[in-house]
Amino acid sequence: MPDGAPQELLEAQLTTRADGITILELAGEVDMSSAQILVDQFVAISGQRLDNVILDATRVTFIDSTGLHALTEGKRKIHEQGTRIFLVPSPQVRRVLELVFPEPLFAARVDSVEEALSQIQLQTTGDR
């Protein structure tokens, strides 16, 4: 990247909705220089013992092997606590995941945050 060219950094925002559903929104590049941001977010999530988390990666433009490692380790850590993770990938993230992991890494991979919310609602209604 030439000097002076802006580098696309990873932005992460963790929010909990009024209904208790937590959404981690990611935007930018998940690579060697930014993967720790993702790891830190997963640590914050794992400390909360949540039922469901939506990982909104629709604005992730690039992910490398370091980012994939952070994603898989974070998913493992959260999943071990019984938290269900809904991944909403960008086309770039979806393609890399499909190439690297022939079997789906995330059982709940959806096309939109709205679809994830709908599935959580159905799951919650079905548990009653």
Show the residue positions of the predicted features.
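STAS-like cytosolic regulatory interaction modules
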Residues: 1-60, 76-128
